[in-house]
C-alpha cells in the first residue's frame, strides 16, 4: 500500500505543549489561547517542540514531533528503537512514575467531566511489572512486496501500516526477543501471503502462538512451524476460520494455565481466551479488589463479566457463595471446569448476554450482598439498569475504559443513591496510554 499524502500544508511549526491528551499526545493551541487544538505525538506538557502536521480536520489537527527545543524534566530516552513509529506503546518518553500520574489525571477528569462525580478518596495507583509484562497480544503480519520481506509486529501510529520490529520490550521476552525469527519463519513459508496475524499467549508453564491462515497450509509449512516450535519451546495452534476452528498443531496437549498462589487457585485457558495481560498487576489487582469489596465469610457476591473466574474463584475462597455471569459461553465452560479443578463448590456460573434483558433469569432473582464487575470497554450500563441495586451494600467496579466508568458512576451516584467512596488508576499496560482503574461505591 502506497503512503498517500493529503493535500494540506505540512510545513513544520514551533509550538508550546500545554497538556497531555487521554491517548498520550501533547496538546497545543497554535494560535494562542483561543486557537485550534493540535494533538502532537511524542510531545510532553511544558515542552516547546517543532512539529510536522500529519492530519487536519474541522475541529482539531494532528502532528508529530520532529525536534524538541525545550524538554520537560520528565522526559526520558525511550528504551525501544521503534518508539515514535510503532503504536504498541506511546509513553516511553515519559518517566515511569509520571505515566501513572497522567493516567490518574485522565481518570479523575473523566469522572468529573462525564459522570459529574468526584471520589471521596483517590486511591494510590496500583503498579506491577513495567517491562516484559505483556503475556497476551496480537501481531499483524504483512508481506510487503516492495521491501521483499514479511513484517510481523504491532501497527504503526499510522494504522494502515505494520511496524517493522526487531524487538519489543513490553512483550514477554520469550516472544519480544524473537520477532525477527517469527518474521523469517513466515517469509520462508509457501503461504506467507495468507497469514494476516499471529496471536501469542503465555501461561505459567507454556507459551502458545496461534497462526491465522486464510488458505490451507502446505505440509511443508506445517513442518516448518513444528520445527520452529520445537526450537523455541512454543506451542503452535492453527486458526483456519473463526474462533472455534482453533486447534493444536504441536504438541497435541498444551498445559495453558496461570496460578494465583495467594488463593491456591489455578486457572486453565485456551489460546484465544481473554486473560489479564500483566500477570504481576493482575495478582495485585485481585487482592486490591477483594479488600475494597470488604468481602466477608458470610457474603453472597455477584461477579459480572467474570470470564474464566479471575475474580470469582479467589472470591470463592473468601466468601460463602459467589455467582459469576459472563457473555462468552466458552469462558463460562472453562470457569466451571476451573472451579471443579480447584475443588470449589460454592461458585456458580451462568452464560448471559449482559447487554440484553436479564430480569427473568435465575441468577438475577437471587439475593446478594455485594457486587464486583469487570466489564469490557463499553461498560455496564445495560445490566446496571436492570439490577435491583438496593440489595448491594458495596460495589467494586474494575474498568478498562475511564469514559464508560464515568458514565456508569454518574448513574450509580446521581440516579441510584450510591456514594463514590474511592477510585484510582491501575497500570495494567505500562508505557501505553491505556487506563485501567477501579472504583468503590456504597449505598447512601
Curated annotation (Swiss-Prot):
Active site feature: 400
EC number: 2.1.1.190
InterPro entries assigned: 23S_rRNA_MeTrfase_RlmD, MeTrfase_TrmA_AS, MeTrfase_TrmA_CS, NA-bd_OB-fold, SAM-dependent_MTases_sf, TRAM_dom, U5_MeTrfase_fam
Keyword Translocase: no
Reaction catalysed by this enzyme: uridine(1939) in 23S rRNA + S-adenosyl-L-methionine = 5-methyluridine(1939) in 23S rRNA + S-adenosyl-L-homocysteine + H(+)
Residues of the TRAM domain: 5-67
Superkingdom to which the source organism belongs: Bacteria
Chain residues that bind [4Fe-4S] cluster: 80, 86, 89, 168
MF terms in GO: 4 iron, 4 sulfur cluster binding; iron ion binding; RNA binding; rRNA (uridine-C5-)-methyltransferase activity
PROSITE patterns (alphabetical): SAM_MT_RNA_M5U, TRAM, TRMA_1, TRMA_2
Keywords: 4Fe-4S, Iron, Iron-sulfur, Metal-binding, Methyltransferase, rRNA processing, S-adenosyl-L-methionine, Transferase
Single GO biological process annotation from the record: rRNA base methylation
Pfam family, any one: tRNA_U5-meth_tr
Enzyme class: transferase
Coiled coil: none
Binding sites annotated in the UniProt record for S-adenosyl-L-methionine: 276, 305, 310, 326, 353, 374
HAMAP family, sorted: 23SrRNA_methyltr_RlmD
NCBIfam families according to UniProt: PRK13168.1, rumA
Homology family: Belongs to the class I-like SAM-binding methyltransferase superfamily. RNA M5U methyltransferase family. RlmD subfamily.
Functional description taken from the UniProt entry: Catalyzes the formation of 5-methyl-uridine at position 1939 (m5U1939) in 23S rRNA.
Protein name per UniProt: 23S rRNA (uracil(1939)-C(5))-methyltransferase RlmD
Amino acid at each position: 500500500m502506497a503512503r498517500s499524502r493529503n493535500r494540506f500544508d505540512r510545513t513544520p511549526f514551533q509550538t508550546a505543549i500545554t497538556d497531555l491528551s487521554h491517548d498520550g499526545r501533547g496538546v497545543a493551541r497554535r494560535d494562542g489561547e483561543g486557537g485550534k487544538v493540535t494533538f502532537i505525538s511524542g510531545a510532553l506538557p511544558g515542552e516547546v517542540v517543532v512539529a510536522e502536521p500529519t492530519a487536519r480536520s474541522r475541529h482539531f489537527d494532528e502532528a508529530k514531533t520532529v525536534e524538541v527545543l525545550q524538554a520537560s524534566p520528565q522526559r526520558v530516552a525511550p528504551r525501544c528503537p521503534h518508539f515514535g513509529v510503532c503504536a504498541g506503546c506511546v509513553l516511553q518518553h515519559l518517566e515511569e512514575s509520571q505515566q501513572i500520574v497522567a493516567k490518574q489525571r485522565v481518570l479523575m477528569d473523566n469522572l468529573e467531566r462525564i459522570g459529574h462525580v468526584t471520589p471521596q478518596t483517590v486511591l494510590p495507583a496500583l503498579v506491577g511489572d513495567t517491562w516484559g509484562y505483556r503475556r497476551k497480544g496480537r501481531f499483524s503480519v504483512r508481506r510487503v512486496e516492495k521491501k521483499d520481506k514479511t513484517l510481523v509486529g504491532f501497527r504503526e501510529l499510522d494504522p494502515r501500516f505494520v511496524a517493522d520490529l526487531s524487538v519489543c520490550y513490553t512483550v514477554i521476552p520469550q516472544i519480544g526477543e524473537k520477532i525477527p525469527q517469527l518474521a523469517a519463519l513466515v517469509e520462508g513459508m509457501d503461504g506467507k501471503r495468507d497469514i494476516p496475524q499471529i496471536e501469542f499467549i503465555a501461561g505459567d508453564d507454556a507459551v502458545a502462538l496461534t497462526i491465522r491462515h486464510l488458505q490451507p497450509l502446505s505440509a511443508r509449512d506445517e513442518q516448518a512451524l513444528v520445527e520452529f516450535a520445537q526450537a523455541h519451546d512454543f506451542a503452535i495452534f492453527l486458526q483456519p476460520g473463526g474462533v472455534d476452528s482453533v486447534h493444536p498443531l504441536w504438541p497435541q496437549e498444551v498445559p495453558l494455565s496461570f496460578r494465583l498462589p495467594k488463593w491456591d487457585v489455578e486457572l486453565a485457558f485456551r489460546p484465544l481466551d481473554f486473560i489479564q495481560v500483566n500477570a504481576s498487576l493482575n495478582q495485585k489487582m485481585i487482592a486490591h479488589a477483594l479488600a475494597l469489596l470488604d468481602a466477608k465469610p458470610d457474603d453472597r457476591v455477584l461477579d459480572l463479566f467474570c470470564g474464566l473466574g479471575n475474580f470469582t474463584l479467589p472470591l470463592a475462597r473468601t466468601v460463602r457463595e459467589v455467582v459469576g455471569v459472563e457473555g462468552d459461553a466458552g469462558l463460562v465452560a472453562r470457569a466451571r471446569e476451573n472451579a471443579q479443578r480447584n475443588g470449589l463448590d460454592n461458585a456458580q456460573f451462568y452464560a448471559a448476554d449482559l447487554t440484553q434483558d436479564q430480569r427473568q433469569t435465575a441468577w438475577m432473582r437471587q439475593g446478594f450482598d455485594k457486587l464486583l464487575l469487570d466489564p469490557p470497554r463499553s461498560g455496564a450500563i445495560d445490566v446496571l439498569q436492570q439490577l435491583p441495586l438496593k440489595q448491594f451494600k458495596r460495589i467494586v467496579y474494575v474498568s478498562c475504559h475511564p469514559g464508560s466508568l464515568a458514565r456508569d458512576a454518574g448513574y450509580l451516584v446521581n440516579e441510584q443513591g450510591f456514594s463514590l467512596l474511592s477510585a484510582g488508576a491501575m497500570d495494567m499496560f505500562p508505557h501505553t496510554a491505556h487506563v485501567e482503574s477501579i472504583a468503590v461505591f456504597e449505598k447512601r
